[in-house]
């Protein structure tokens, strides 16, 4: 069986216009996949040079396959049908290592056609590293490497304003573009680079903050033999991902034209502020996960897919989203409902086995950040507590018993909560404290909740009633009236 290369698999090759820091699965099934579609359907005509930003020889370089690799996108489409689509990606030309090919790395700045910089160097990638110097070959941190590359471009083109770059980080931190820009400016000042360069950074370059959303499941180790048999070739860089994707970019409106999104619309939004989209994702996608997990798991289910195929649990989650979360969010309702519909479709994806226990990690913090704001906003708006979000809190407290049908399961959270719950549930079993007292102790933890939740009218009583129902009847019976 042949291995992918451009000689045996000839096809389009595009001029290099994009630098990409990061060779991982996510960028290849997200950014490079989108660039490939735009190259095919428009005159974007842009090839990607992947820069490996860390010193590692594993995985091997994409250049061993001349930049070629296959994405397999699978999940439920807009009609709810299971689809699996294999695509040979030709947008990547080559990969270089900034550690072993530093001169080649700097030379990227000399190419007048270079226009975009994408990156995903993990959440820790956009950070300051004390001691990074201009003359390091290379510096340690990604922002320092980028500063050096930008200065190379500024110098090579004598500060030409038409030679700036559009810089689009995909790291999962809030306002990643702003954070990256601040660090680049910090290095420029630390290294005493000319004032003209600092002005050029602001005048000629755009740092765009982003929200990225796609579950990328990466190399399909367990299915490789079967998939390669179907494809008819060997691919060491096979990359799998879900059908859904969303790319929100906070940047100039002209970006839509530059990326040719006006000619071939993708699920890419160019916006003035990513904040409402971030809030939407946290509240609907992450919030639904967090509400679902303790309810579904204690109802005897193990994966998100099983939960969504269970009529009662699915109804509970959908009503929580549409009746209690969406009404308190600050975006047009049709946009929110469209996003919610995509989310529930993603939860049903038969190709992804998302274990409920893995999502349950740090459940107390997740509840505070993902559900509590909507619970409190709903109570404020209507004067009554949202029934399902409140029930989800009771289910979460019950989950920390660590026992289902007589069998124990691992609960992962910070030591404070694990010890606290062990003590509280032990006291409850010994009838030292009642359910309402247990709930009041949990809700009074100001350091965690950032307020005293026992002061929210009716919250202790309702959570305690729900918790008693769960303990006395079991999760199935307790949740049924809310389905």
Curated annotation (Swiss-Prot):
Q: Provide an example Pfam family for this protein.
A: Mannitol_dh_C
Could you name the domain of life of the organism this protein comes from?
Bacteria
> At which positions is NAD(+) bound?
18-29
An example Gene Ontology molecular-function term: mannitol-1-phosphate 5-dehydrogenase activity
Q: What class of enzyme is it?
A: oxidoreductase
Q: Which pathway features in its UniProt record? A: Carbohydrate metabolism; pentose and glucuronate interconversion
Tell me which UniProt keywords the record has, alphabetically.
NAD, Oxidoreductase
Its GO CC terms are: cytosol
State any GO BP term from the record: D-galacturonate catabolic process
Which InterPro entries did the record assign? 6-PGluconate_DH-like_C_sf, 6PGD_dom2, Altronate_OxRdtase, Mannitol_DH_C, Mannitol_DH_N, NAD(P)-bd_dom_sf
E.C. number = 1.1.1.58
Catalytic reaction list: D-altronate + NAD(+) = keto-D-tagaturonate + NADH + H(+)
Kindly indicate whether the keyword Acetylation belongs to this entry: no
The entry's family comment says:
Belongs to the mannitol dehydrogenase family. UxaB subfamily.
Task: Please name the PANTHER family in this protein's record.
Answer: ALTRONATE OXIDOREDUCTASE-RELATED, MANNITOL-1-PHOSPHATE 5-DEHYDROGENASE
The name of this protein is Altronate oxidoreductase
Tell me which species this is from: Escherichia coli O139:H28 (strain E24377A / ETEC)
Name the gene that codes for it. Answer: uxaB
